[in-house]
């Protein structure tokens, strides 16, 4: 019985606070006092037993565990409802495969209404919400899934994706780390964690620009060197460079035609890009792959 005394003490404390409120009639206050005395007698607790007090009031504990997560404390689902809910989940998964995300959200929502304490339904709806760019709703669904099952690694992973999309990289890192704690061998979590950590370093750096491409590797790329050398043999580029040098030496007075030089430079750059595309498409693909890698990966995140 001693193990429940802190709980009973919290109940007594709550009842005593209520009895001192003006919202109750004298008879109601008297009834509360009787209830307090009964509990103190049965569990052998007195007001002096302050060592039984917990850090949070009973009302705050209740709010944190139930109201904050918007989860019904008990499920009234019957077996028929559970079966129907699972069927709706499967329908939602099919809609996800067909990229019909709004319909998927609707199916998962119906499943939740039938079986509100199933973490998978909330987590799957979070995935659909993210596909619709409803990232705040996705995070809320992940939080609900975690409230039901604190060991659900996929909920932490999907919350990390939504947080990354909202540029909340520090929180995303925390979510991915928790997901990896629960599922250490998941390559998707590892990859997304690295991306979030890189993004966090970029935004935290005083000189961060958000660009992480290795320019040194590009410059040292033999194909790039060949293309650059070829470009410099272009008579138009040679004429442009000569004109720019003349303007630089001549000072402001020689700056007439600067806009023309800029236009020529842009045109030369376009020719350079076209030449690379024609002669070395692999280098262009390297640049494209880098751009793609900057987007967080979610394709490997399968649905339950």
From Swiss-Prot:
The modification N6-acetyllysine is found at residue 131. The modification Phosphoserine is found at residues 293, 295, 297. The keyword Hydrolase does not apply. SMART domains: TPR. Pfam families: SGTA_dimer, TPR_1, TPR_11. Co-chaperone that binds directly to HSC70 and HSP70 and regulates their ATPase activity. This is Small glutamine-rich tetratricopeptide repeat-containing protein beta.
């Amino acid at each position: 019985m001693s193990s429940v005394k802190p709980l009973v003490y919290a109940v007594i404390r709550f009842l005593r606070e209520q009895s001192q409120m003006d919202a109750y009639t004298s008879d109601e206050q008297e009834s509360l006092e009787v209830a307090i005395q009964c509990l103190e007698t049965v569990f052998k607790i007195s007001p002096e037993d302050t060592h039984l007090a917990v850090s949070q009031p009973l009302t705050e504990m209740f709010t944190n565990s139930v109201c904050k997560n918007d989860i019904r404390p008990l499920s009234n689902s019957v077996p028929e409802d559970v079966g129907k809910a699972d069927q709706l989940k499967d329908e939602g998964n099919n809609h996800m495969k067909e990229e019909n995300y709004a319909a998927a959200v609707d199916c998962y929502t119906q499943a939740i209404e039938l079986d509100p304490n199933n973490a998978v339904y909330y987590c799957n709806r979070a995935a659909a919400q993210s596909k619709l760019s409803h990232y705040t709703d996705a995070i809320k669904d992940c939080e609900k899934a975690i409230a039901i099952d604190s060991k659900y690694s996929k909920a932490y992973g999907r919350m990390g994706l939504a947080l990354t999309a909202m540029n909340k990289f520090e929180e995303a890192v925390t979510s991915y780390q928790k997901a990896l704690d629960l599922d250490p061998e998941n390559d998707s979590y590892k990859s997304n964690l690295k991306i979030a950590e890189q993004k966090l370093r970029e935004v935290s750096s005083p000189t961060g620009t958000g660009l992480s491409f290795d320019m040194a590797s590009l410059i040292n790329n033999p194909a790039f060197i060949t293309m650059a050398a070829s470009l410099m043999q272009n008579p138009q580029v040679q004429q442009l460079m000569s004109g720019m040098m003349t303007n630089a030496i001549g000072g402001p007075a020689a700056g007439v035609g600067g806009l023309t030089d800029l236009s020529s430079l842009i045109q030369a750059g376009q020719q350079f890009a076209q030449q690379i595309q024609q002669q070395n498409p692999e280098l262009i693909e390297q640049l494209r792959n880098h751009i793609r890698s900057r987007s967080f990966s979610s394709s490997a995140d399968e649905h339950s």
